[in-house]
Amino acid sequence: MREKVVSLAQDLIHRSSISPNDEGCQKIIAERLEKLGFQIEWMPFNDTLNLWAKHGTSEPVIAFAGHTDVVPTGDENQWSSPPFSAEIIDGMLYGRGAADMKGSLAAMIVAAEEYVKANPNHKGIIALLITSDEEAAAKDGTIRVVETLMTRDEKITYCMVGEPSSAKNLGDVVKNGRRGSITGNLYIQGIQGHVAYPHLAENPIHKAALFLQELTTYQWDKGNEFFPPTSLQIANIHAGTGSNNVIPAELYIQFNLRYCTEVTDEIIKQKVAEMLEKHNLKYRIEWNLSGNPFLTKPGKLLDSITSAIEETIGITPKAETGGGTSDGRFIALMGAEVVEFGPLNSTIHKVNECVSVEDLGKCGEIYHKMLVNLLDS
């Protein structure tokens, strides 16, 4: 299986699919799946290409989810080999997307192919949900496919997202949930004036100082058995004209919260508004909700992937919910059990992104055993 996975991964890496461009990756995948009898449905939205492929006719529906888009390469001169050459050096496959996530995407596809070849009349439905809009806006990708499926009353029972979840060794971590993410873009109004005549102006930075202290020290919650406490970080602050003798007219503050299931986005919005009113600030705020938290509690999917990892590499993975958001947050809206598993994440988005070819082969075996555990038991 390793050779098949690595070969497909190289084919995908060769295509410079900077988000939201697909550059023919999904066509390669669709042609392979179609030969095995998968039903292929294209779901393009604006400049994003999405693929929904399925094999079988009855529940449960087991979906593999992934993305063909990648982040920009950065300075290509810093790479040991060209970022889209997909070279193998000392057992490592190098290239943009090798770990995030064309390698695991290839492993999921080969696993599905091998299972269908051996079990053409399998029970359940094996599906693949693939998008080219995960690394950037994530507005026309998985969420649009999910919305389409929901309007048709189609179900996903279990979903494996192939994000690179492993930390130090393949299989040491699986993600069974993610925190929510919400960003506030806050504009605090003042009155511009000369710094020598502060009584004729109103400095929004000074006015906001106590509010910022409260915002950054407030304890939102203590977390729970599945999630760490909610975290707030200020990402950007800007005010002033660049001159040292002008009191600014406005202060811009951008902050982000990664929040657990102990709070909601509405609770966060309400509390921030209370703080702003408490400090008598003139303001306007724009909120951007990237996704609510989701959690897959111990059950059939988590048991199946845990068992598959134990059988293949002999370790028991730890289920965690840390890290950034993923498209799993959209699929969870369908009521599906969602788990993320993939190769090591230590080089993702970096120069010289790479993945072990041995690990890619193991990923394919693990995904295949997961299918066996879910459909043959």
From Swiss-Prot:
Keywords, in A-Z order: Amino-acid biosynthesis, Cobalt, Diaminopimelate biosynthesis, Hydrolase, Lysine biosynthesis, Metal-binding, Zinc
| Described function | Catalyzes the hydrolysis of N-succinyl-L,L-diaminopimelic acid (SDAP), forming succinate and LL-2,6-diaminopimelate (DAP), an intermediate involved in the bacterial biosynthesis of lysine and meso-diaminopimelic acid, an essential component of bacterial cell walls.
Q: Which reaction does it catalyse?
A: N-succinyl-(2S,6S)-2,6-diaminopimelate + H2O = (2S,6S)-2,6-diaminopimelate + succinate
Name the catalytic site residues.
Answer: D69, E134
Subunit annotation: Homodimer.
Q: Does the keyword Kinase apply?
A: no
Enzyme class at the top of the EC tree: hydrolase
Annotated protein name in UniProt: Succinyl-diaminopimelate desuccinylase
Cofactor binding note of this UniProt entry: Binds 2 Zn(2+) or Co(2+) ions per subunit.
Listed under GO biological process in this entry are: diaminopimelate biosynthetic process; L-arginine biosynthetic process; lysine biosynthetic process via diaminopimelate
List the GO molecular function terms: acetylornithine deacetylase activity; cobalt ion binding; succinyl-diaminopimelate desuccinylase activity; zinc ion binding
What PROSITE patterns does the annotation carry?
A: ARGE_DAPE_CPG2_1 (PS00758)
- Native organism taxonomy: Bacteria, Pseudomonadati, Pseudomonadota, Gammaproteobacteria, Pasteurellales
> Which gene is this protein's source?
dapE
The UniProt transmembrane annotation reads: none
Q: Which CDD domains match?
A: M20_DapE_proteobac (cd03891)
Protein family according to the UniProt entry: Belongs to the peptidase M20A family. DapE subfamily.
Q: Name one Pfam family in it.
A: Peptidase_M20
Annotated binding of Zn(2+) 2, by residue: D100, E135, H349
Look up the EC number in the record and give it.
3.5.1.18
InterPro entries found in the cross-reference section: ArgE/DapE_CS, Bact_exopeptidase_dim_dom, DapE_proteobac, Peptidase_M20, Peptidase_M20_dimer, Peptidase_M20A
Positions annotated to bind Zn(2+) 1: H67, D100, E163
* Protein's pathway: Amino-acid biosynthesis; L-lysine biosynthesis via DAP pathway; LL-2,6-diaminopimelate from (S)-tetrahydrodipicolinate (succinylase route): step 3/3
Cofactor(s) annotated in UniProt: Zn(2+); Co(2+)
